[in-house]
């Protein structure tokens, strides 16, 4: 019996919607990253993008445990000397709530072209409304 290998043109992708309200950031991000990679499918192949599309709603209501809301820092750099910027979780969730989930999930995906393709299948929205109703996403309980 030969080992099955998924082909990119035969992969069937589904759409799922995840409600992040009241969810813990890390636990939510690990499940999303796993589904973006396709590891929940029996036909998972490491060198082929077999994952599904994930739509995350209510990103502004995601939570972290302990004192991380004030202690967890997000860093960015402009590329110029002295160009490092930092912002904590509380301020970032008020300024751009989508970036919190996007950053957490992106760090859990492969750092190569395949990982960037997987990341493009993640759609995050601050509120409950999203423009992907035409794809008829199924609700995913995490």
Swiss-Prot record:
Cited SUPFAM superfamilies: Ribosomal protein L13
Disulfide cysteine pairs (residue numbers): none
Keyword Transit peptide (UniProt): no
Record-level GO BP terms: negative regulation of translation; translation
Matching InterPro entries: Ribosomal_uL13, Ribosomal_uL13_bac-type, Ribosomal_uL13_CS, Ribosomal_uL13_sf
A cellular-component GO term for this protein: cytosolic large ribosomal subunit
Gene3D superfamilies with a match to the protein in the record: Ribosomal protein L13
GO molecular function per UniProt: mRNA binding; structural constituent of ribosome
CDD domains (UniProt xref): Ribosomal_L13
Glycosyltransferase keyword on record: no
Keywords: Ribonucleoprotein, Ribosomal protein
Quaternary structure and interacting proteins, as annotated: Part of the 50S ribosomal subunit.
Family as reported in the entry's similarity comment: Belongs to the universal ribosomal protein uL13 family.
Protein function: This protein is one of the early assembly proteins of the 50S ribosomal subunit, although it is not seen to bind rRNA by itself. It is important during the early stages of 50S assembly.
PANTHER family: LARGE RIBOSOMAL SUBUNIT PROTEIN UL13M (PTHR11545:SF2), RIBOSOMAL PROTEIN L13 (PTHR11545)
The protein's name in its UniProt record: Large ribosomal subunit protein uL13
Source organism per UniProt: Pseudomonas entomophila (strain L48)
Gene: rplM
């Amino acid at each position: 019996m030969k080992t099955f290998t998924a082909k990119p043109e035969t992969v069937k992708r589904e759409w799922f919607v995840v409600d992040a309200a009241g969810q813990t950031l890390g636990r939510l991000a690990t499940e999303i990253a796993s589904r973006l990679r396709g590891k929940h499918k029996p036909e998972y192949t490491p060198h082929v993008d077999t994952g599904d599309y994930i739509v995350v709603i209510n990103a502004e209501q995601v939570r972290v445990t302990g004192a991380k809301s004030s202690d967890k820092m997000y860093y960015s750099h402009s590329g110029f000397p002295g160009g490092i910027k930092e912002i904590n979780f509380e301020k970032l969730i008020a300024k751009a709530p989508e970036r919190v989930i996007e950053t957490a999930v992106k760090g859990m995906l492969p750092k190569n072209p395949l990982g960037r393709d997987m990341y493009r299948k993640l759609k995050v929205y601050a509120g409950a409304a999203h423009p992907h109703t035409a794809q008829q996403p199924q609700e995913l309980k995490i």
